[in-house]
C-alpha cells in the first residue's frame, strides 16, 4: 500500500475523528477538509481545498479504502474509512496499534515518548514500554520501521511504511522535534489555564464577588 501525502492525511483524519468525535462521524467533505487543515496535531499543517480533498477521496474510494455513507437523508455525502478493522480490510490492529498508525499518518515520524503523549485521546498506554511493544508488532507486519537515532537524541523515531515520506521528515533536526513537543505541551498548559480562569469567574459570579 502506497498512499500519497493527501491520502495519508485523509485516512489519518478519519481514524482520529472516528475515535475522538464518534457523534460526528462519518465526515462530510467540509468536515474532512477542516480536519485535514487543522493546526493542532498535524505536521505539516496543510491548506487543502475541497477539490484537492475530493480528488484524494475519489482515489481512496477506487482503492476501496474509503466508502460513501449517504445517510438517511441522502443529501450530503459522508465518508467512512475501510482502511483497517473492518470486514472489508485485511489490516487488523489493536486499539494501541491503531492509535500509533493514526498519529504517524497525521504527524510523520515520532519517538515512542512523543507517541505516548499524543495518543491520550486515542488509546491508553501505561508506559513508553507499552508503546514500543505495539511498535514492534507493527514492525513485524512491515507497517512501521525504526529510523536511525538522530545526533544528540536518546530515542529513535518510528515511521510508517504506508506511503512516501519527505526526506526532510526522515532527517529532521533533533532540535525541531524537541521544540515541537515543548510547543505542544505549552499549548496544553495554556488551554488548562484558560479553563481554570473560566471556572474561577463562574465561582466569583456565584458568590457575588
Curated annotation (Swiss-Prot):
Q: Which Pfam families match?
A: DUF480
| Organism placement in taxonomy | Bacteria, Pseudomonadati, Pseudomonadota, Gammaproteobacteria, Alteromonadales
- This protein is called UPF0502 protein PSHAa0076
Q: Which PANTHER family match?
A: UPF0502 PROTEIN YCEH (PTHR38768:SF1)
Matches recorded under InterPro entries: DUF480, WH-like_DNA-bd_sf, WH_DNA-bd_sf
Q: What family is it from?
A: Belongs to the UPF0502 family.
Amino acid at each position: 500500500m502506497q498512499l500519497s501525502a493527501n491520502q495519508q492525511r485523509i485516512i489519518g483524519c478519519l481514524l482520529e475523528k472516528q475515535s475522538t468525535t464518534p457523534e460526528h462521524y462519518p465526515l462530510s467533505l467540509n468536515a474532512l477538509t477542516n480536519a485535514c487543515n487543522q493546526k493542532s496535531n498535524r505536521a505539516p499543517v496543510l491548506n487543502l481545498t475541497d477539490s484537492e480533498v475530493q480528488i484524494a477521496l475519489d482515489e481512496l474510494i477506487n482503492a476501496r479504502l474509503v466508502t460513501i455513507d449517504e445517510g438517511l437523508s441522502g443529501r450530503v455525502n459522508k465518508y467512512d474509512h475501510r482502511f483497517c478493522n473492518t470486514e472489508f480490510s485485511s489490516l487488523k490492529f489493536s486499539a494501541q496499534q491503531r492509535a500509533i498508525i493514526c498519529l504517524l499518518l497525521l504527524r510523520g515520524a515520532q519517538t515512542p515518548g512523543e507517541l505516548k503523549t499524543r495518543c491520550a485521546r486515542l488509546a491508553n498506554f501505561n508506559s513508553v514500554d507499552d508503546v514500543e511493544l505495539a511498535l514492534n508488532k507493527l514492525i513485524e507486519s512491515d507497517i512501521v520501521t525504526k529510523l536511525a537515532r538522530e545526533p544528540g537524541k536518546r530515542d529513535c523515531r518510528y515511521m510508517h511504511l504506508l506511503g512516501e515520506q519527505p526526506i526532510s521528515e526522515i532527517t529532521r533536526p533533533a532540535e525541531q522535534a524537541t521544540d515541537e513537543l515543548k510547543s505542544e505541551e505549552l499549548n496544553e498548559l495554556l488551554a488548562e489555564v484558560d479553563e481554570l480562569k473560566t471556572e474561577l469567574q463562574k465561582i466569583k459570579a456565584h458568590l457575588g464577588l
